[in-house]
Amino acid sequence: FTKKLAGRKLKAGEFSFVLKNAAGEEVETVKNKEDGTVTFSELSFDNTKVGTHTYTVEEVIPATKELGMTYDTMKATLTVEVSKNGHTLTTVTNVSSADGVNENGESTDGTEDKEFNNKITPPETPVFQPEKFVLNKEKYDITGTKLVDDDNELTNEYTETNANPYADKTNNNEAENINTKTVERGDKLVYQVWLDTKNFSDKNNIQSVGISDTYDAEKVTVNAADIKAYDSVTGQDVTAKFDIKVENGVITATSKASMNKSLGDVDNTQVIDTTKFEFGRYYKFDIPATVKDTVKAGADIENKANQIVHVYNPVSKSVETPEKPTQKRVNSVPVTVDLKFTKKLEGRTLAAGEFSFVLKKDNVAVETVKNDKDGKITFKKFKFGKDDLGKTYTYTVSEVAGTDTTVTYDDMVATVTVKVAHDGTAKAIVATVTDAPDKEFNNTVTPPEEPKFQPEKYVVSKEKYDITGDKLLDDDKELADKYADTNVNPYADNTVNNDVENLNTKTVERGDKLVYQVWLD
């Protein structure tokens, strides 16, 4: 007889075959050779065995069948007719089979079929597609599918976002979906990864399922204890069904060995027990991550994940690990631009808050600030993120002219342009600043002309003397400098040319009334 095995190479001694007599008693059991031949020992007949002898040959189907193996149930009946002609014994052997198939699976009933055909079939390849999202909250829509259509604008969201994570447009995203959006240092992100078992069944011989998530360990902090898994059908927390680890920037979550059962084969192959770990659903993982304070301005924070399925293949007797990626997701920290100018004042010391300066963006005022005591002019930092990509902004800074007539104000208008782009090599948003050539506002203080005045002083004998006149002015004209001379010696004034009412230097009596007339000039 012969043995054929479809699906993989036949091994010597892999299958057993039994020869039985008409009474159903075992005569001999043998195994196949590597080339598929099945050979029993010769049967001998003597003069006492003249007549018809019937035997059957069947494959011995083991109590514990090999996974995926379809055994040939054919029973071949051998009829040996022994006859004697003179002193010579002759035999004629006929074979007829029942319940057998040929290598194409077609029935061979009633034919002289001497070939046992077995077939081993690998398990169906599991069909799955994991998903990945970046959210601003935990436990979002665990039992729903609101996020599924957030990438509908893409032809192939998996290949396109892995090539360029910014390919995802936000206009059709859920509000909780913050993929591609700008985040601040210290913000909490929630990476939600969906492990897909929707199309799995027992026939897949799945030994374990899990996800592998690669995160930017230099830019975000992830703690294994914070990671949770939820059943998308029941909404229950099923974290206890997974072994979760965080090592070297990679998060792994794999179904526990305690979720398995034996297939009952000779190798005691372990597969997932669907009474403990149900298929036909997503297992959604919430992975909280906090943006580190040390992230460089403009830096991309990328995240990607894969789903791995361990499948036992009885054909190769090996474990296969089909794997599929999720979408790649990205966030970025804003890039900042400082607009700083200086103020100088000639003519006197500059005071804090003395002058005002207005900043305009595209000719619209956005902020007005004052100088400090050192002349520094500092506007608030400008932040640029994903929404600014491809844009160029023009800023102008000018001094707000004051009303102090002693100050000459600088009428300079300083122009700064900022061009925002994404550097794919550096994986960062960059702002290219074209600064103003002159960033110093210069004012000059011109003091007023010193007022010219000369007060006068007289001693007269009457009040309201010559109030509207100037008769007294020439009373000291005999002096070269009446102010200096009289301050040194008030008797320097000679009375010969004084008005009669002018009593300066004259003798007066006790009780006399003098009138000091002072002229404010």
Regions found by a protein language model. Give the residues of each.
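Solvent-exposed loop/turn and edge beta-strand elements of beta-rich ligand-binding domains
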Residues: 1-521
